[in-house]
Amino acid sequence: MVDAAINHTAVEVKAPEGRPSDYFGEKVFGRAAMRKYLDKKTYAALLDTMDNRTPLTREIADSIAAGMRQWALEHGADHYTHWFQPLTGGTAEKHDAFAEPDGFGGVLEEFSGKLLVQQEPDASSFPNGGIRNTFEARGYSAWDPASPAFIVDTTLCIPTVFIAYTG
């Protein structure tokens, strides 16, 4: 298993058809998408956070999450992941679905500001975790609002920083 991970090769990605200017940025929740999917107050607050590192309120984070989710669903995403790059040179992710079972045979669609901003994944499967005590394996991922979210296949990738008990 470790050998397979170490010897893993990059996935070949086929370039889309047409001119790059026709598809450039279409799967990125950049400023143009933000302007379209966020109300003016939320858009201005997010730009202030991106440009000046101003903290977001819970209300604004909820509004950003709603707009980002709507954009992602309209672009074919059905899952989201907090995506980060550990010091191993690869990438790591924690996947979740926009729809969760409600316990009554249906589903709830949820993606709140709380889910966007911070997650508490079990880091025991990450390079810092496997041989640690459980409490030491805990890790946190926090959204990086200055890096735009993007879609790969059917997954919304939310750029994050990952922090673990051991660094």
Set out the residue ranges of the language-model regions.
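Active-site core of metal-dependent hydrolases
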Residues: 22-146
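Divalent-metal coordination cores built from histidine and acidic residues
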Residues: 1-27
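ATP-dependent carboxylate/acyl-activation modules
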Residues: 137, 145-167
